[in-house]
Amino acid sequence: MNKPLRNSHPLFKIANNALVDLPAPINISSWWNFGSLLGLCLIIQILTGLFLAMHYTADINLAFYSVNHICRDVNYGWLLRTLHANGASFFFICIYLHVGRGIYYGSYMFTPTWLIGVIILFLVMGTAFMGYVLPWGQMSFWGATVITNLLSAIPYLGMDLVQWLWGGFAVDNATLTRFFTFHFILPFIVLAMTMIHLLFLHQTGSNNPIGLNSNIDKIPFHPYFTFKDIVGFTVMIFILISLVLISPNLLGDPDNFIPANPLVTPAHIQPEWYFLFAYAILRSIPNKLGGVIALVLSIAILMILPFYNLSKFRGIQFYPINQVMFWSMLVTVILLTWIGARPVEEPYVLIGQILTVMYFLYYLVNPLITKWWDNLLN
């Protein structure tokens, strides 16, 4: 009997097993759309970035003006640039919702998949930070100076490490060149890591909203979830295009319209909105090294979830107190984002410190409450 080409061709077989004949749980909700949306975001970013790189010049005297040239003189350059800048925001919206879904429904119990996901998150954050430096505006330059300077908090090696990263004694041409190099290569590394992420996910199959084994009740990915994903694509692309065409600079920083000047410090140095929560955590610790450790831990703490699970049921759908705690933690992250954009003065400092403690406490207390709830129902 002749097999369809998708089942016999060595290359098509891989794609078929991942996208067409993949058995998927019948009851996965729209919260499971974000994986494919992230794939779409990555493709949009790589394509727009590729065309931007053709016209961009990684030189401190020309970078700002090359971005200006892209927006004014290159055919649809303004569209490429605004799509790329706002595409990054949508990437982070999707990635945070994707992680939040994983925490809520206990998807972190797929340990290798989860750990690779956290590594991808770190890589994407690094990529976005370096991309923000490239236009060489005021906030680009000072953001790069402040964040790279954090490495100087590392005992003994600190200053040597910072100067090695800068390629000199300050953020200069060497820094911009290497940031452009890394910003170009990292998305392809993220793409490779995504393949590994999917490889591990397909070893176990997807989780589902009730957290039970769904092997007895699965349907093929195509056509059911391909069409469901396309609905998600349509909604996201519509919102992205609307933002790009109506208010492309809404999420940017006005300071970045001023060329970088090492002699003038902006009143408020802050990163893009999607890093503000981590920036607020960094500023909440009065000690420099402590702040750096807290900054890294704000993301790295996700890695403890698979190893610190004490509940009988997967996810927190069946734990009412934990649900309240989860949504409180979400509000905490939103408030931290707000605090990150405020000046360093009272009452913002104290609020930031309280929120930081609340953020970290969630990860430590949550499993204990699930255990207590299980014991209560025994």
From Swiss-Prot:
Heme b b562 binds at H84, H183. Keywords: Electron transport, Heme, Iron, Membrane, Metal-binding, Mitochondrion, Mitochondrion inner membrane, Respiratory chain, Transmembrane, Transmembrane helix, Transport, Ubiquinone. One of its GO terms (cellular component) is mitochondrial inner membrane. It is found in: Mitochondrion inner membrane. The chain crosses the membrane at residues 34-54, 78-99, 114-134, 179-199, 227-247, 289-309, 321-341, 348-368. Heme b b566 binds at H98, H197. Disulfide bonds: none annotated. GO terms for biological process: mitochondrial electron transport, ubiquinol to cytochrome c. SUPFAM superfamilies: a domain/subunit of cytochrome bc1 complex (Ubiquinol-cytochrome c reductase), Transmembrane di-heme cytochromes. Binds 2 heme b groups non-covalently. It holds the Pfam family Cytochrom_B_C. InterPro entries: Cyt_b/b6_C, Cyt_b/b6_C_sf, Cyt_b/b6_N, Cytb/b6-like_sf, Cytochrome_b, Cytochrome_b_C_euk/bac, Cytochrome_b_N_euk/bac, Di-haem_cyt_TM. It is a multi-pass membrane protein. A ubiquinone binds at H202. One of its GO terms (molecular function) is metal ion binding. The main subunits of complex b-c1 are: cytochrome b, cytochrome c1 and the Rieske protein. PANTHER family: CYTOCHROME B (PTHR19271:SF16). Heme 1 (or BL or b562) is low-potential and absorbs at about 562 nm, and heme 2 (or BH or b566) is high-potential and absorbs at about 566 nm. Component of the ubiquinol-cytochrome c reductase complex (complex III or cytochrome b-c1 complex) that is part of the mitochondrial respiratory chain. The b-c1 complex mediates electron transfer from ubiquinol to cytochrome c. Contributes to the generation of a proton gradient across the mitochondrial membrane that is then used for ATP synthesis. Belongs to the cytochrome b family. This is Cytochrome b. It comes from Drosophila sechellia (Fruit fly). The gene is mt:Cyt-b.
